[in-house]
Amino acid sequence: MASPAPLVASISHQMVALQTLQLLQQEWGWGDGPSAPGSPRGPDHVPIAQARRPGQLRTRRGLGRGSIGARGSPEAGGLRGAEGGAELLPFPRDRGPCTLARMAMRSALARVVDSTSELVSVEQTLLGPLQQERPFPVHLKDSVEFRNICSHLALQIEGQQFDRDLNAAHQCLKTIVKKLIQSLANLPSDAHVVACASLRQILQNLPDV
């Protein structure tokens, strides 16, 4: 029986990334809370931080290898969103008028959040049992990179760097899904076919940008 450890670790990193993005949505007034469609479902779901105050997200130092440019140290009293995730620092919720660019940014962020939620759900409910029955490759480093990109994204307010980080998160998430599909493609069982179909549906919701 194959060890589920790489898949479990990948899910853990993805959930930290998801919690960071959900907190970012909520602090900007863009999220509907843990029960929103973007929230992972199932008994293994780790809810986002319950106590929070309006603020900007900043990553902690020491996110681990692959952290891309996390700047600054957490200030006293920051709220940890998740272990290795981001901290919440005071920042006003009023971010100005809702321009077309901001609407597009909100839509792109929501797409990444929803797709990450669906990926975690598929991994927990479908891929976990399959990994125990028959081994398939899991590329853990991609999930670590995704987590670090999302943590760096949370440092940004708006502008070109935010857009670049959001696009990087989008592309990294697509890479994770594509590699899982490739890993499952040559496995013959009906369960693997169902899992591949679910992953392809996620991929369809992540068009090229």
Curated annotation (Swiss-Prot):
It comes from the Eukaryota. Residues 28-87 are annotated as: Disordered. Pfam families: DLEU7. InterPro entries: DLEU7. This is Leukemia-associated protein 7 homolog. It comes from Mus musculus (Mouse). The gene is Dleu7.
